[in-house]
């Protein structure tokens, strides 16, 4: 409707109740000419002359003549005057309020709208404050009850996704995570309101509208009519369509059509497209088979469109050529083809509430697990309380979820609720390396209320004295870490506080005392979380300090960015941190071998390191690092007995807690965190991404020593491997870093015995090949070493010693040239530890008569051979 001849005021000159405020965007002034809002056309006033209809108490009603019009609803764009907040009665003068009450008053009769009909009859409808109309500026939650903001809801990509797409974030981090905004501006920003006045006589022709102010001023910006039979502002719940895209469409880097409010590829008039993601096609045979990791294929020509819309909405598609294609939603949802160029299939709505329970088969006890559910079209079906799309950005999702390639999972404590579609539903449930993973297909019917799944614990290594652990987890809350640990079968989770430039994480979770999940702290003692620290320097390296008591070992980082802040001087070395950790009863671990290769060499030579860690964010992407193991071999080859541990270094939802983990044999010890640390120090460990492996050499376990006479002898090596999913492909017997024997495996378990003649001191370990993702060369497991002394002679490889010495020399060079000093005395003291390590290893080279070469190092050595 064109209201130009009825406009009687300038919105810019409206009274005090309509004045702009700081934080306004000027959006109201952009409402000019013909515009569409929430899929409805409105004609707004131009900048020339009056541009709004002001209804003022005492003034005669505005009568707007209509051509003969059949309408079910009349829609008004309008706003009431801001009403100053009044102090509550009886309080006198009051201070600032955290939650102001602007817009909360309700029920006053702002105006009366009359519908006049061609037959001469008339109907009056009251327009009440905060029902059909609301003021411009409102406080949080002061929504109108029967009107919507004119602004429609918008959908946002997450902050990380915007960066992937090469554009600036469209919303702040929080809104990006929420992925939506309602259109209501509260606390800051301006609003106008859209009200659909129902016509009680839709079968009678309208001839005019009569708008009369009652108790206060209001402004009418625009009016339109509709013949829709259902309320034009009431949308349906979420629905989905599987759409085969016409030619000319390309999915973005996320595998989606861009539904961000800045996008142009897809949209709806009377509704909102929530997402348009590529169809994921799963192999039914693989799903029901023995494959470790069943990934779907992302389809480039079909998308699942999820939306909330009015039944009479239209879907719009715009391909690369810019032409706009329109399709009636009723036709699409009816299952027919809207046109020859658009093939659609309805996706059964997920509306059946189902309780999911996960039990242990033998005991019937409810157990935590990792759960994935998807529908017949590959659509992910998260339980209530979890994201429909897991955010894999670093430091962006701590919600007990996991994204493994294209599969998404939630962590549940044995029970959850999910809205599921009728028909086949695909379920995967995992619970660590001793429980057989479950993949199945269940049929949901109209009578399905509960799904109960039983998990079969087929391996019993825990009962044999083994416990599993992840030495390296970040960002999760202790309770979330405890849940994920339970669900992944990880008995010990080490959650590490850390510094990242100016960012500090998990610091408030550290108290130097609490072991979450322990019996002393209200748990059952079977799954534990302990907060330690990862203390870090960009050049000299990182060190994990686990389980220490008392005060936090600070600084968490130093020596400048990125680990510390710019300008943060070198006020500690890793040796300094390690000594303090030992003094406070903790376990010192060198994380994520082989990097950074610098001071770790000195600290190992000084005997300050209890274990060395191999790291894998997610075994599907990369398993146990050959480079990290080669670095560990180097230290074993010069006589430093370091147990192996493993951790995930989890920093995002794409990293799997316990994906690479340590198994530690407690033996006769009770399971406590302190006993776990002692067991790690004793060295009977193995690391794995699936297969469990045990080895003895002449009955001695890893961490132990076999002594032989100077003449040597033949050693008997016994081993066994068991797995619930990742098959061991072959077993390699490693001696001093070299493969001496190789045995092929078949199936999920194997065992054997080898004889090995030995005539010099060495170390022996088992390395297991096998893959989560089907890569033949992947390393799936590795034991710590058994040490063999022949005639009391040491293990010492000169080339490895020289390599380690060079790392120490490099660390000294850094301290002498680039390290930002605190003060001379402290710097000299810190440097002295590195000099001591250099002296010890250098002296050992001379003591053993090993010829070696020094690299030129600033102020330490000149180039020479001896």
PLM segments and residue spans:
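N-terminal/edge-of-domain interface segments
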Residues: 1-299
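Short domain-boundary/entry signatures in modular proteins, especially
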Residues: 228-229, 346-353, 455-468, 688-689, ...
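C-terminal functional module detector
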Residues: 217, 251-254, 265, 270-300, ...
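Flexible loop/turn segments at secondary-structure boundaries
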Residues: 50-51, 83-85, 133-134, 216-219, ...
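Structural beta-strand segments of beta-rich domains
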Residues: 72, 352-354, 713-717
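Catalytic cores of extracellular degradative/oxidative enzymes
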Residues: 434, 462-644, 648, 654, ...
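A short, Gly/Thr-enriched small/hydrophobic beta-strand-prone motif that recurs across taxa
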Residues: 75, 347-363
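Surface-exposed acidic, glycine/proline-enriched linker/cap segments
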Residues: 156-188, 387-415, 511-520
């Amino acid at each position: 409707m064109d209201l130009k001849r009825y406009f009687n005021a300038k919105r810019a000159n409206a009274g005090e109740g309509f004045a702009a405020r700081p934080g306004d965007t000027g959006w109201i002034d952009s409402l000019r000419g013909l515009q569409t809002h929430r899929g409805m056309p409105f004609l707004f006033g131009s900048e020339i002359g009056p541009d709004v209809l002001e209804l003022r108490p005492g003034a005669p009603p505005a009568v707007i003549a209509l051509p003969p019009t059949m309408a079910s609803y009349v829609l008004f764009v309008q706003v009431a005057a801001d009403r100053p907040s009044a102090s509550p009665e009886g309080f006198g003068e009051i201070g600032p309020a955290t939650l102001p009450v602007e817009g909360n008053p309700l029920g006053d009769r702002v105006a009366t709208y009359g519908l006049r009909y061609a037959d001469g009859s008339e109907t009056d409808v009251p327009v009440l404050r905060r029902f059909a109309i609301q003021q411009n500026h409102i406080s949080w939650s002061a929504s109108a009850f029967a009107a919507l903001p004119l602004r429609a809801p918008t959908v946002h990509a997450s902050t990380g996704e915007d960066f992937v797409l090469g554009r600036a974030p469209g919303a702040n981090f929080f809104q990006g995570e929420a992925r939506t905004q309602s259109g209501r501006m509260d606390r800051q920003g301006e609003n106008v309101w859209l009200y659909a006045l129902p016509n009680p006589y839709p079968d009678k022709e309208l001839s005019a509208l009569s708008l009369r102010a009652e108790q206060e001023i209001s402004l009418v910006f625009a009016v339109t009519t509709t013949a829709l039979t259902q309320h034009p502002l009431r949308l349906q719940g979420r629905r989905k369509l599987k759409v085969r895209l016409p030619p000319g469409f390309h999915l973005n880097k996320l595998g989606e059509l861009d539904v961000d409010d800045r996008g142009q590829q897809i949209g709806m008039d009377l509704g909102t497209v929530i997402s348009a993601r590529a169809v994921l096609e799963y192999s039914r045979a693989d799903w029901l088979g023995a494959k470790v990791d069943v990934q779907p294929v992302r389809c480039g020509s079909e998308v699942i469109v999820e939306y909330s819309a009015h039944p009479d909405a239209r879907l719009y598609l715009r391909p690369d050529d810019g032409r706009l294609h329109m399709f009636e939603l009723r036709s699409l949802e009816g299952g027919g083809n809207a046109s020859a160029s658009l093939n659609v299939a309805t996706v059964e709505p997920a509306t059946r509430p189902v309780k999911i329970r996960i039990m242990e088969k033998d005991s019937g006890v409810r157990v935590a697990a990792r759960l994935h559910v998807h529908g017949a079209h590959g659509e992910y079906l998260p339980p209530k309380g979890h994201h429909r799309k897991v955010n894999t950005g670093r430091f962006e999702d701590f919600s007990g979820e996991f994204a493994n390639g294209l599969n998404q999972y939630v962590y549940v404590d044995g029970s959850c609720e999910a809205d599921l579609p009728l028909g086949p539903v695909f379920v995967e449930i995992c619970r660590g390396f001793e429980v057989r993973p479950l993949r199945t297909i269940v049929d949901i019917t109209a009578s399905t209320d509960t799904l109960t799944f039983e998990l079969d614990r087929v391996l019993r290594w825990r009962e044999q004295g083994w416990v599993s652990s992840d030495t390296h987890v970040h960002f999760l809350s202790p309770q979330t870490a405890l849940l994920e640990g339970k669900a992944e079968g990880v008995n010990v989770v080490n959650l590490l506080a850390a510094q990242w430039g100016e960012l500090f994480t998990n610091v408030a979770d550290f108290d130097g005392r609490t072991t979450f999940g322990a019996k002393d702290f209200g748990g059952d003692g079977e799954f534990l979380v302990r907060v330690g620290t990862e203390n870090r320097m960009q050049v000299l390296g990182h060190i994990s300090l686990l389980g220490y008591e008392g005060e936090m070992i600070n600084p968490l980082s130093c020596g400048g960015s990125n680990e510390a802040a710019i300008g943060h001087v070198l006020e500690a070395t890793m040796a300094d941190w390690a000594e303090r950790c030992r003094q406070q009863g903790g376990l010192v671990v060198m994380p994520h071998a082989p990097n950074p290769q610098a001071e770790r060499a000195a600290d190992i030579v000084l005997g300050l390191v209890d274990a060395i860690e191999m790291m894998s964010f997610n075994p599907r992407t990369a398993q146990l690092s050959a480079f990290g193991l080669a670095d560990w071999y180097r230290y074993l080859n010069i006589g430093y007995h370091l147990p192996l541990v493993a951790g995930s270094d989890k920093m995002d939802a794409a990293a799997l807690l316990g994906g690479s983990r340590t198994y530690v044999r407690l033996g006769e010890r009770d399971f406590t965190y302190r006993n776990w640390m002692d067991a790690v120090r004793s060295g009977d460990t193995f690391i794995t991404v699936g297969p469990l492996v045990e080895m003895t050499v002449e009955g001695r376990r890893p961490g132990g020593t076999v002594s032989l006479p100077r003449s040597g002898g033949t050693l008997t090596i016994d081993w066994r491997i068991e797995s619930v999913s990742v098959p061991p492909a072959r077993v390699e017997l490693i001696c001093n870093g070299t493969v001496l024997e190789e045995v092929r495996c078949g199936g999920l378990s194997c065992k054997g015995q080898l004889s090995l003649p030995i005539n010099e001191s060495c170390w022996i370990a088992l390395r297991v090949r096998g893959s989560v993702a089907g890569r033949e060369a992947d390393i799936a497991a590795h034991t710590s070493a058994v040490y063999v002394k022949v005639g009391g002679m040491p293990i010492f490889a000169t080339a490895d010693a020289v390599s380690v010495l060079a790392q120490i020399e490099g660390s000294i060079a850094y301290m002498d040239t680039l390290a930002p000093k605190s003060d001379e005395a402290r710097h000299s003291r810190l440097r002295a530890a590195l000099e001591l390590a250099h002296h010890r290893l250098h002296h050992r080279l001379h003591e053993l008569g090993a010829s070696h070469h020094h690299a030129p190092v600033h102020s330490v050595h000149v180039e020479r051979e001896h």
